[in-house]
């Protein structure tokens, strides 16, 4: 299920636009994740008090965590599938400490694509979206494999 060189180029080109505003993109991704999938908020102890969109919008901690999430994902995407060294510690913390189900990784992947499509519609057409979906699916599948290595069925 690897990506072609052209698909990786599409992924990294649009990711460059995401990186131009990590706080804006990251904050929007997490707000949308919690709005569209409220059950995911239960996995974030420090954000459980954020009940309304206004509270989420005003949260600097949520914005900072959004930057962390997208920064780490960017490091993984830039490895073009050769992401073992970046992925392993992330999978370990998500499996053993945070206990984030793979389903939640699917949710955030969907949200990431929606947010990019809204913010960069002219640059994120069907081909780029398909490439990003493949890249995020590769990431999720590899996370799921690592989860099993750490004894988490996620």
UniProtKB/Swiss-Prot annotation:
Residues 2-148 form the Globin domain. One of its GO terms (cellular component) is sarcoplasm. One of its GO terms (molecular function) is heme binding. It catalyses: Fe(III)-heme b-[protein] + nitric oxide + H2O = Fe(II)-heme b-[protein] + nitrite + 2 H(+); H2O2 + AH2 = A + 2 H2O. It holds the Pfam family Globin. Its EC number is 1.7.-.-, 1.11.1.-. Monomeric. Belongs to the globin family. This is Myoglobin. It comes from Phalacrocorax capillatus.
């Amino acid at each position: 299920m690897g990506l072609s060189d052209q698909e990786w180029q599409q992924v990294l080109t649009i990711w460059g636009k995401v990186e131009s505003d990590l706080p804006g993109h990251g904050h929007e991704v997490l707000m949308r994740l919690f709005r569209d999938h409220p059950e995911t908020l239960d996995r974030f102890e420090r954000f459980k008090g954020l009940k309304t969109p206004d509270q989420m919008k005003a949260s600097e901690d949520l914005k900072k965590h959004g930057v962390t999430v997208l920064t780490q994902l960017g490091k993984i995407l830039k490895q073009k599938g050769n992401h073992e060294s970046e992925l392993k510690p992330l999978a370990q913390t998500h499996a053993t400490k945070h206990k984030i189900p793979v389903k939640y990784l699917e949710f955030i992947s969907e949200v990431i694509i929606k947010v990019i499509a809204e913010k960069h519609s002219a640059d994120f057409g069907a081909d780029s979206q398909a490439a990003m979906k493949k890249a995020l699916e590769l990431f999720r599948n590899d996370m799921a494999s690592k989860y099993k290595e750490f004894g988490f069925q996620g």
